[in-house]
């Protein structure tokens, strides 16, 4: 393990890079912006080897994720507040289609009145969209939970929302233990080239009910 001083948003970017994500559609919104800025820099520096796609809106970003997930790619995006509200319709589609993806959300209040302070209303309003929601309480938890989320989404066939407080965690520096790439690779094997999906019997309800069990199982494996 390598010790680093990271913000919550930097921890997300490091975890995405370590997870060998293949497609990242990106659109900035405060306080999430430095997630995609860090990934853009990692792409420019040759650290991130996946596709980094700059899009014109949060809605388009999630639409890209849906298309990439249909093709079997490991995919990720990030947003906050009104950006998450904007993609509400597509959240239902991603979950209903049983697509594997991870979305990081830096909690921020919804207007009106206009406010950029931390508030969980944005993610709580998406409770019934069918996404697994994982909430973080420290920068270390953010990095660990993003890694966990990619395993949970792959095994449960449901998209995962990783949630953390805007500014209080997204912009605060904390000491973080970053695992080596080889250790992450052993925990997150590549996705199969031909994902198995039983089209005639999606079992959406079973998948959602099984997701909490899968999350606990993956957490135990993560700590092993």
Residue ranges, per PLM feature:
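Conformationally flexible catalytic loops at phosphate/diphosphate-handling active centers
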Residues: 160-224
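Conserved anion/nucleotide-ligand pocket segment
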Residues: 132-135, 140-178
């Amino acid at each position: 393990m390598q010790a680093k001083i990271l913000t919550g948003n930097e921890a997300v970017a490091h975890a995405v890079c370590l997870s060998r994500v293949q497609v990242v559609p990106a659109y900035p919104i405060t306080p999430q912006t430095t997630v995609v800025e860090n990934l853009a820099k990692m792409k420019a520096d040759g650290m991130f080897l996946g596709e980094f796609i700059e899009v014109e809106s949060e809605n388009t970003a999630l639409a890209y994720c849906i298309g990439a997930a249909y093709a079997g790619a490991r995919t990720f995006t990030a947003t906050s507040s009104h950006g998450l509200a904007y993609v509400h319709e597509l959240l239902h589609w991603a979950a209903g289609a049983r697509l594997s993806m991870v979305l990081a959300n830096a909690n921020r209040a919804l207007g009106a009145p206009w406010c950029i302070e931390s508030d969980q209303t944005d993610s709580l309003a998406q409770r019934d969209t069918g996404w697994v929601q994982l909430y973080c309480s420290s920068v270390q938890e953010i990095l660990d939970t993003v890694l966990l989320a990619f395993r949970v989404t792959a095994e449960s066939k449901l998209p995962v929302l990783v949630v953390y407080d805007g500014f209080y965690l997204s912009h605060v520096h904390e000491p973080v233990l970053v695992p080596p790439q080889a250790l992450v690779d052993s925990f997150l094997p590549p996705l199969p080239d031909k994902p198995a999906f039983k089209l005639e019997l999606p079992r959406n309800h079973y998948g959602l009910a099984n997701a909490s069990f899968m999350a606990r199982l993956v957490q135990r494996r993560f700590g092993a």
